[in-house]
Amino acid sequence: MFGKGGLGNLMKQAQQMQEKMQQMQEEVAKLEVTGESGAGLVKVTINGAHNCRRVEIDPSLMEDDKDMLEDLIAAAINDAARRIDETQKEKMASVSNGMQLPPGFKMPF
């Protein structure tokens, strides 16, 4: 099943990957990403744990209707969440680089 040293190499790779994943999780938790909507009139910043850190609303929107402002805030939150997910996937791809993972295997994020 495993060639000469195959199991040992597999265990070594698994431990290295676990260490890299731990380091990556710590880095991702520190990330902050800003999502925007309305051409930058609404900005929402979230961290790697998807917690909202900041909401910025252009003063010109305070005069417009409430429904539009609510829609722009929701769109900015969704944009920020999408951006943090993309960043996490990119970082995790670098961790698993070289590992032969089964098709469809998902990292723990």
Swiss-Prot record:
Belongs to the YbaB/EbfC family. This is Nucleoid-associated protein Spro_1136. Binds to DNA and alters its conformation. May be involved in regulation of gene expression, nucleoid organization and DNA protection. Gene3D superfamilies: Nucleoid-associated protein YbaB-like domain. It is found in: Cytoplasm, Nucleoid. Residues 11-21 have a biased composition (Low complexity). It comes from Serratia proteamaculans (strain 568). InterPro entries: YbaB-like_sf, YbaB/EbfC. Keywords: Cytoplasm, DNA-binding. One of its GO terms (cellular component) is bacterial nucleoid. Residues 1-21, 90-109 are annotated as: Disordered. Homodimer.
